């Protein structure tokens, strides 16, 4: 289900499939969703049509986290439907309806973001417990591994985002918090504790990009789980990008 906040009301749109992520497109009121069986366009009425799916996508896999780069390309990872399926996880790029493989050999590809000022792409493969940095070619969308940017010691890393200073904000599944790490040193700078163990993702929003929005997964016995939280951290985020239908 895709939930959209409009004028203080929540609009819920059923997809009939697992939905890993959704991003707005450059067409007003339209969204691009990464579902179990591929990439689909949506609007407030539901699914409009399928764009496509990777020809080499393994069986029993679905799309998970996804995000657009500044060129309007969608990057989306795939994970096993029923847990760990080995290192068959991949990161795909959708550009102008064409799908290409960016990374492979991962177990559970998850959060990602770009630092265009430094020419870096950050990617999480959850079981590794790290955030990895890659040199990023914005013209070709190619990546090459650079270094480990941060090591997560409480829980495992899930979703992530960057702030305006280039720091890494990481949702720590099983750790009950979002932590901020300096990109150059990996040192922890700040943390936001949540009343939920399984913190799944985070992003900056609001008029001034100074609100951190945090998602949590429902967990039996935890009254504070399964909610979307908002908090001020003293940091500002970066502009996010929509999918470009060129």
What are these regions (language model features)?
Residues 203-246:
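Blade-level signature of beta-propeller repeat domains, shared across WD40, Kelch, NHL, RCC1
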Residues 5-8, 43-47, 94-98, 135-139, ...:
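Short loop/turn segments that connect beta-strands within beta-propeller blades
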């Amino acid at each position: 289900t895709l939930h959209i906040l409009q004028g203080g009301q929540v609009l819920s749109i059923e997809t009939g499939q697992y939905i890993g992520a959704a991003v707005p497109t450059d067409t007003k009121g339209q969204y691009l969703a990464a579902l179990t069986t591929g990439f689909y366009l949506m609007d407030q009425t539901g699914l409009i049509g399928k764009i496509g799916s990777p020809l080499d996508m393994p069986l029993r896999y679905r799309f998970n986290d996804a995000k657009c780069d500044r060129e309007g390309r969608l990057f989306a990872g795939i994970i096993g439907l029923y847990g760990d399926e080995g290192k068959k996880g991949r990161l795909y790029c959708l550009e102008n309806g064409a799908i290409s493989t960016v990374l492979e050999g991962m177990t559970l590809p998850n959060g990602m973001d770009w630092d265009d000022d430094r020419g870096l792409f950050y990617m999480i493969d959850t079981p590794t417990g790290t955030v990895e940095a890659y040199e990023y070619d914005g013209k070709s969308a190619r990546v090459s591994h650079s270094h480990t940017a941060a090591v997560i010691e409480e829980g495992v890393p899930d979703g992530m985002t960057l702030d305006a200073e280039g720091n890494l904000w990481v949702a720590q599944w099983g750790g009950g918090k979002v932590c901020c790490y300096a990109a150059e040193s990996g040192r922890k700078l700040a943390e936001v504790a949540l009343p939920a163990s399984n913190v799944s993702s985070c992003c900056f929003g609001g008029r001034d990009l100074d609100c951190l929005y945090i998602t949590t997964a429902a967990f039996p016995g935890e009254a504070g789980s399964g909610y979307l939280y908002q908090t001020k951290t003293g940091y500002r985020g970066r502009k996010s990008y929509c999918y470009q239908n060129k």
